[in-house]
Amino acid sequence: MSRLIVKGLPKYYTEEKLREFFSKQGDVTDVKLMKKRNGESRKFAFIGYKSADAAERAVKYFNKSFIDTARIEVEFAKTFSDPTVPLSFKEKRKREEQKLKDEQERLLEQELRAQAKKQKTKSTSEIDDEIASNPKLREYMEVMKPSHQVKSWANDTIADGSGGPSVQDLENALNGNNESPVDKSNIEVVNTVEDASDDEYNDFKELSNKHGENEDEEEEEEMMSLGDLPTNEENKDKNESGENLAANENISDLEWLKSRSTRIKENGEVPEIVPEVKEVNEVTEATQQSDNEPEMTPEEQIAHKIEETGRLFIRNISYEASEEDFRSLFSQYGALEEVHIAIDTRTGKSKGFLYVQFLKKEDATRAYRSLDKQIFQGRLLHILPADKKKDHRLDEFDLKNLPLKKQRELKKKAQAAKTQFSWNSLYMNSDAVLESVASKLGVTKSQLIDPENSSSAVKQALAEAHVIGDVRKYFEDRGVDLTSFDKKERDDKIILVKNFPFGTTIDEIGELFSAYGQLKRMLMPPAGTIAIIEFRDAPSARAAFSKLAYKRFKSSILYLEKGPKDLFTREPTTNEVATIPEQQQNEHAVEAKISANEILGESKEDDEIESVQGPTVAVFVKNLNFATTVQALSDLFKPLPGFVVATVKTKPDPKNSGKTLSMGFGFVEFRTKEQANVAISTLDGHVLDGHKLQLKLSHKQGTGTSASSIKKSGKSSKIIIKNLPFEATRKDLLELFGAFGQLKSVRVPKKFDQSARGFAFVEFNLMKEAETAMSQLEGVHLLGRRLVMQYAEQDAENAEVEIERMTKKVKKQVATQNLAAARLAGKGKIELEEKDEEDFD
């Protein structure tokens, strides 16, 4: 917890005074003094610290202390999600209003249900009464009953005898009684039907229509009482006329179609189509369904939108926070695609908000639910859903219409920021290297490289090694840590610019990159083969990288690579940001040079350390700060003579597996007892990270191998060269490595067809010569391939050691083959023996 609440403050205290008062124990990121509506102080405030350790120290230091004459109480602040936080008066009133509203809605719903039930019962009874009072309607309802509700053996009469002729009426009709209510026309119809033939069918139809017209009209009038909608007379007439035309055999299909079609003039208006009118019951049901759906709470609406985009908008962040701080915070919930802090382009400072894009949308939802309104670096994070990022890239449909060369160029640009380059960080254009060396020697490039000479490739490799050495020396003098190039983590603010033509000036590079933001540092060695650009802020550097990657520049194409983290060991000087070539050339005369061995960790002292034989003298260092690292302790004792190594004792962290905690003490080893006593007299009582150190001689002796044995263990006078061109010969290796010392042997293994296998072994007489060759030829290209060099194992001194080594090697090869076979067959896994063994002898 990095946020505190301070109670009992004086009324006249302001936020500026609070910030000044509480900054004694750490960096204060936020000060919030609570006030009333009239601006009067409520005598409590919230203080935010950048780290939880600083907040903890502040609680111990300031709690129950005094500000002027007021005694203050300092405690850790609670988050909104803490169940122990009491509700405010506003929140209580809001909940009571919501409860009352829910109760009113429940009562209203019950009333509506009762009315609907009553209305349904009333309408059912009205229909039953109407059927009982109307014989014709009752007969119709009986006839229209489904077959499973009608008894097939029952008489076709109405239950109460009404609605049909009685037995007396039928007898009178058969006897020809004129008083019968049955119309004579009905009898004529029956007789006609019995004696009719097929030719007289039309007459019978006309006769039946005459008797049926009045009945249909009466039935329609009776059915109107059910509330049916009135029919459209015009549509009825049109349908009847269409049916008559269809029944007429003399009308063709085309004439019938014309009669059913409507002609529209060329410039006439299209008649509006009347939408279908829904039933009243259907509309009511749809309305009821929408009312029954539960409304989403504001939190659920935010989570639903986050699930659609997978992007978060976080505000109220600390202005000193970096993208790496939030990357480590949000990466706990899933893989991140982008973390972007909004930067003010005029000042280069944060605007106080950022965007986080997750690869998986569900991870963004989990991060929102976990971190919203939580404390980070002393501030309450407010997380909202962000709109989807605008993508201006071309899709596959647009790309396929472009030429193939343009498609590849655009795809390279899109993948530039994600691709890990295969070349080394100090890659240089071979043509620029030769131009630089030729210019330095005062000869032409053709004179330097003779195309008819078989050793031209070796000369080019040696020239590249010379230029790389000069570049290393230049960068080391400017505070560049070359060992950081081996790190995997990259810094978005640093860009390595490569492959530009020889003769390019620092002004041209600066003008090219300054269009995307303010530059903090520019370095380009006199060889003019590579440059390092550092931007003031990361967004500007990302924009420049995406726009300039693989961009054609003069006669070449720019290769850009993001620089490693912690590349620079110091802040830039005024000369390092200058763009005038004269200042660049005179830089080395102004600045104090730093030894290359110091940057690489191979200083003269290290050479002396390697020569230490036997036990060393250890100094016990007590009362270390738990935050003090080995590097900080080493930096303190390194200037003293005889320093060997410094260590801080640690123990496993029970809360975080894989991490360690400092035990508050350590040891520093020196070569002699006199040098250890000098260190004690010099630094005893020195304050490091806020703690006063206590030094005394340790009763145990140092091993003397903690620093030197690590360096010596992997070194030998034999080097293995990998990624060797197949065209390279033994003569080329003799010329290349012979420039750095006397060679003992050079071996290039070959296949059965006498072709090279792509690696070789070179052995020097002295280990120092092998180290020189390794350092000078690192990153050098031979025939277009970068040489990868490692120290090889020394040859066995006797046959038994050689047999044991070969046995281990064969076991490893057999285990590898078994593992491959098991994977293909799907039988499982075979664990390899994890031992420190070399692939090559």
UniProtKB/Swiss-Prot annotation:
GO terms for cellular component: 90S preribosome; nuclear speck; nucleolus; small-subunit processome. Disulfide bonds: none annotated. It comes from the Eukaryota. Keywords: Nucleus, Repeat, Ribonucleoprotein, RNA-binding, rRNA processing. GO terms for molecular function: RNA binding; rRNA primary transcript binding. InterPro entries: Mrd1_RRM3, Nucleotide-bd_a/b_plait_sf, RBD_domain_sf, RRM_dom, RRM_dom_euk, SLIRP/GR-RBP-like. Its main location: nucleus. Residues 214-223 have a biased composition (Acidic residues). One of its GO terms (biological process) is endonucleolytic cleavage in ITS1 to separate SSU-rRNA from 5.8S rRNA and LSU-rRNA from tricistronic rRNA transcript (SSU-rRNA, 5.8S rRNA, LSU-rRNA). It is found in: Nucleus. Pfam families: RRM_1. Belongs to the RRM MRD1 family. This is Multiple RNA-binding domain-containing protein 1. It comes from Candida albicans (strain SC5314 / ATCC MYA-2876) (Yeast).
